[in-house]
Amino acid sequence: MQRVNPTRMELLKLKNKIKLAEKGHKLLKQKRDALIMEFFQIIEQASDLRDKVEAKLAEAYKDLIMAQTVMGTLAVKEAALAAKNDKLEVDMDTKNIMGVTVPTFEIYNVRRKVGERGYSPYGVSSKLDEAAKKFEEALELITELAEIETSIKLLAEEIITTKRRVNALEYVIIPRLKSLKKYISMRLDEMERENFFRLKLIKSRIEKREAEGETV
């Protein structure tokens, strides 16, 4: 038991602390529940987006294999080496989700026309162009997926932190404060009874002396 002065002022302070702790506990539980709901919604978005990325990459690789069949592996490799994108840009910003700051990614200059990819369009299979187009689309989706998965990680960390704070209040801080409040209330009651009996004893002695004085 924490050492505390059993006074009415201390009891009032404890009552206010309990009220504040219970209010904080309620707000944190609401925040935790809202974070969990948001977390599972974003998990669902990530799952859908991951399926899209996998499907798009599968289509792109299928077209790439067909282009290799028509053009040959060496020609496809040469075209791929020529197709580097120097204009590709990624901007990073932040947004707020339920009080959690998460990054946002914006990618630019991903999609290009046939003549902008660095290799000559002449003598190149249309399947190579299709593959390049689908890889570009997949890159946009992957950037979006990276943003969502980073948000998931940060939200999960915030949920864990909030749960710990809720549990600390619910199972440690509030019970401890209530225990102290009970202890002080009991001590004040004891002190009040002691004072009552002491005053009663003093009154009895005074009355006895007065009675003895009257007798003399």
Swiss-Prot record:
Biological classification of the source: Archaea, Methanobacteriati, Methanobacteriota, Methanomada group, Methanococci
Q: What does this protein do?
A: Component of the A-type ATP synthase that produces ATP from ADP in the presence of a proton gradient across the membrane.
Q: Which gene encodes it?
A: atpD
**InterPro entries registered for this protein in UniProt:** V_ATPase_D
Q: How does activity depend on pH?
A: Optimum pH is 6.0 for ATP hydrolysis.
Q: Which organism is it from?
A: Methanocaldococcus jannaschii (strain ATCC 43067 / DSM 2661 / JAL-1 / JCM 10045 / NBRC 100440)
State whether keyword Membrane applies: yes
* Protein name in the entry: A-type ATP synthase subunit D
Q: What family is this?
A: Belongs to the V-ATPase D subunit family.
Q: Which keywords has UniProt assigned to this entry?
A: ATP synthesis, Cell membrane, Hydrogen ion transport, Ion transport, Membrane, Transport
Could you give one GO CC term from the UniProt record?
A: plasma membrane
